[in-house]
Structure formats: structure tokens, C-alpha cells
């Protein structure tokens, strides 16, 4: 039976007879522990012998060295192991350190192994500057203790011979040099880390002060925006009062359209006609009403313009400025008015001999802008963005008028086609 083993010292795998494993007699192919460290003799071919040299018998392997190895697989024939290796069926498990350290059998390497270890150790050891410095320190200390002088009574060879018994002191000095260098390196790293930490604390304090200043500026900016909005409302109300005093109320449109004008009550109309004959008459200013108040299922948008409450709530959930503006324009003017109006009252340049349509009332356009402004102000406080979005109100209303006219023309075509049939 053959064993596929992995030597721990050089991590090389070989297929060897089970007789190469000391004190190992497997009964089957699974009778081994892959987590155990075995003592294995290496054969001559694994030691780098010449191919012509005859293989040694198992009884002659005692002269060879024992090596720590891990058994990975067992097989009846060597070719079976080779096939398993080629097919990658053999896996190398991880070996815990406890099995390597607690293996007492592997520590007995025999006298020849110990002799080789003692022979190779001095040859493989190279002197270093630290060792020379330590030897010189020991020699100097011995000279001070014994009152010796290198220039008079001793030669360098004798000094080193006398210093050789103090190898323990040399080792202690050498051990003391390494922690000192390590201590200095750690001290430098610690000082560097302290400097970096001090720098980071300064940066953190500077950032904190900047954040506090930004928070104060943002608070002041919010107060200014609120004040500006309040001033705009007061300005609009003042304009309404002035228009009423001049006799042209903002709720009176240029054309008498039922959907966009508010007729005064009969009593007020008679009062106006009676007092208009006197030279000192001024129309009484109408009470200025707050925006977005509810009354009998209506919502007040300002300047005496009321819209349906249910439609207003549906408008608040509308997505996008374009759709919001178009729906609000339909709620204020109605499709019948919009299709016969234009935003500015100027004829289009796309058609020759185009007849200009009456413009939309400016104060109602201002109401549309104010409603859109209140909506945008809830999303952002950037005045540049607000102004940019408000500048598209006329464009949105113009697009809505074009859509209404287009749908009306399509409806007329369908009716004409139906009548022809």
C-alpha cells in the first residue's frame, strides 16, 4: 500500500510506501488521520539521489532522516495515487498548529540529525555589525574589570578568546539593542500620529465653525425670504386697493364674460350710481381677503378669484410646473375663454394676415404666477431657480391655448366627416 504524503518543511508531496511512515500500519484506505503529523522517512529518490543508484530497502531507511509529514491519501497501487492527483481528487486540508506542536514523536530525529544540525548552524550563521559591536562592548567591560590594556599585554586573538566566555552578556546586549530601536521607532510613530491627530482636530474645529456660520446665514436667508414674500403680498394688496380707489377693480375684465367676471350686488350698484354724481365720491375699498381661504366649497386665490375646492385639492397633487400651470389656467379662465384669447394679445408671426386675439387679463396672470411661486417656494429657496421656473408661465399657457384650439379643430373635422356620411 502507498501513501500520498506532504512534507511540512518544504511543502512537497510524494507517493511513498506506507512502510516509510514510522509506527503506521493502516488496515484500509481510510485508516489515517489527515490532521495528524506523522514521522516519515524520505527515500533516496526524494533526497535527490542519482537515478542510477539502487533504492534502499525499508530496513536501511533508519539511516535516513525523519521528517514531519501529513498523509493526504492511501491507495493499493502507486498508479492509483498518480491518477487521483492528475484528476485533482486529492485535497490538502488545513493543518492546525496544535497537531504540529504536540507531536512528540517527530521531535526525536536521531543522533545523525542532531549532528547535522550542530554542524550546519555555525556555517550558516553570518556575523553582523550588531554582533561585533556587542563583542567590543563586552571586551571593553572586561578590560575595565580586570585592568587589562589592549596595547600592552594582550593581542586581539587573546581578547576574543577571553571574551568568548561572556557570550551570555553579548546576547543580553544584543537583545537590549533591538527593543531600543523598536522603542525609538514606536516613539516616532506615536509622535507622528499625535501630530496628525492635532492637525485633524484643527481641521474639525475649522469645519465646525464654518458649519455654524453657514447655519446662521441659512437662517438669515430664510428670514429674508419670508419677509420678501410677506412684502410681496402686502404690495399686491396695496395695488388692489389703489385699483379699487381709481375705479377699475382688478376683478373687472375687459370683456363681459360670465366665467371670469364678478357682478356687484344690486344694492351696491345703485349706491355707486347715486354717489357717482357727486364730485367728492371715491369708491369704497373692498376688504382685502387672505389667500387660500375656504368659503362655501370655494378657495380664494387672491384679487377676488375663487375656484372649486375639490378641483383645487386635485391641483395640489399635480406633478410638474407645466401641468400645474395649464390646469390652473383652465380653472381660472375656462376652455371657452382660453381658445379665443392669447397671452400677450400680439398676432403670431407664423401666419400672414393673422388677426391678434384679445390678451388675457394681467392681474389673473399675476395670480397664476403667485400660485406657482408659492408651490415652488415649498420645494426650494433658490431665487435664481424660482425666477427661471416662473419665467415659463406664459409659455405653458400658450401651449395650453394651442392644445385647446387643436382639439377643437379635430372635433370639427370629426363632426364634418360624420355629417358627410
Swiss-Prot record:
Coiled coil: 180-243
Pfam families: BEN
InterPro entries for this protein: BEN_domain, BEND5
PROSITE patterns xref list: BEN
Domain BEN: from-to ranges: 302-408
Keywords (A to Z) from UniProt: Acetylation, Coiled coil, DNA-binding, Isopeptide bond, Repressor, Transcription, Transcription regulation, Ubl conjugation
GO cellular component, one term: Golgi apparatus
Covalent cross-link Glycyl lysine isopeptide (Lys-Gly) (interchain with G-Cter in SUMO2) as placed by the record, residue numbers: 258
Location of N6-acetyllysine modifications: 133
Family matches, as SMART domains: BEN (SM01025)
A GO BP annotation: negative regulation of DNA-templated transcription
Residue stretches spanning the membrane: none
GO MF annotation: an example: DNA binding
Domains: entry comment: The BEN domain mediates DNA-binding.
Function summary: Acts as a transcriptional repressor.
Protein name listed in UniProt: BEN domain-containing protein 5
Organism: Mus musculus
Gene that this polypeptide is encoded by: Bend5
Amino acid at each position: 500500500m502507498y501513501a500520498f504524503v506532504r512534507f511540512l518543511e518544504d511543502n512537497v508531496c510524494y507517493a511513498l510506501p506506507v512502510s516509510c511512515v514510522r509506527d503506521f500500519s493502516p488496515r484500509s484506505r481510510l485508516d489515517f488521520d489527515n490532521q495528524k503529523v506523522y514521522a516519515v522517512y524520505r527515500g533516496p529518490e526524494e533526497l535527490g539521489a542519482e537515478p542510477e543508484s539502487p533504492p534502499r530497502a525499508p530496513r536501511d531507511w533508519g539511516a535516513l532522516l525523519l521528517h514531519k509529514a501529513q498523509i493526504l491519501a492511501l491507495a493499493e497501487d502507486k498508479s492509483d495515487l498518480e491518477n487521483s492527483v492528475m484528476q485533482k481528487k486529492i485535497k490538502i486540508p488545513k493543518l492546525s498548529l496544535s497537531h504540529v506542536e504536540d507531536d512528540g514523536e517527530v521531535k526525536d530525529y536521531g543522533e545523525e540529525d542532531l549532528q547535522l544540525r550542530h554542524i550546519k548552524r555555525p556555517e550558516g550563521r553570518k556575523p553582523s555589525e550588531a554582533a561585533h559591536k556587542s563583542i567590543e562592548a563586552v571586551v571593553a567591560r572586561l578590560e575595565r574589570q580586570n585592568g587589562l590594556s589592549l596595547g600592552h599585554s594582550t593581542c586581539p586573538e587573546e581578547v576574543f578568546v577571553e571574551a568568548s566566555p561572556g557570550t551570555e552578556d553579548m546576547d543580553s546586549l544584543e537583545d537590549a539593542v533591538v527593543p531600543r530601536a523598536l522603542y525609538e521607532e514606536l516613539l516616532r510613530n506615536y509622535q507622528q500620529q499625535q501630530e496628525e491627530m492635532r492637525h485633524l482636530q484643527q481641521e474639525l474645529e475649522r469645519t465646525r465653525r464654518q458649519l455654524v456660520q453657514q447655519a446662521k446665514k441659512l437662517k438669515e436667508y430664510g428670514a429674508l425670504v419670508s419677509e420678501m414674500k410677506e412684502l410681496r403680498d402686502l404690495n399686491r394688496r396695496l395695488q388692489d386697493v389703489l385699483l379699487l380707489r381709481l375705479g377699475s377693480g382688478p376683478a373687472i375684465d375687459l370683456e363681459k364674460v360670465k366665467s371670469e367676471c364678478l357682478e356687484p350686488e344690486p344694492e351696491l350698484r345703485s349706491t355707486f350710481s347715486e354717489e357717482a354724481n357727486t364730485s367728492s365720491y371715491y369708491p369704497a375699498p373692498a376688504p382685502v381677503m387672505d389667500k387660500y381661504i375656504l368659503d362655501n366649497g370655494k378657495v380664494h386665490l387672491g384679487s377676488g378669484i375663487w375656484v372649486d375646492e375639490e378641483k383645487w385639492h386635485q391641483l395640489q397633487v399635480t406633478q410638474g410646473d407645466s401641468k400645474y400651470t395649464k390646469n390652473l389656467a383652465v380653472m381660472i379662465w375656462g376652455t371657452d375663454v382660453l381658445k379665443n384669447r392669447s397671452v400677450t394679445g400680439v398676432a403670431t408671426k407664423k401666419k400672414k394676415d393673422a388677426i391678434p386675439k384679445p390678451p388675457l387679463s394681467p392681474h389673473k396672470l399675476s395670480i397664476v404666477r403667485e400660485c406657482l411661486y408659492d408651490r415652488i417656494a415649498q420645494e426650494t429657496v433658490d431665487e435664481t431657480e424660482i425666477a427661471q421656473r416662473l419665467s415659463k408661465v406664459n409659455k405653458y399657457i400658450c401651449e395650453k391655448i394651442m392644445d385647446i384650439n387643436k382639439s377643437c379643430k379635430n372635433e370639427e373635422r370629426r363632426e364634418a366627416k360624420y355629417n358627410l356620411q
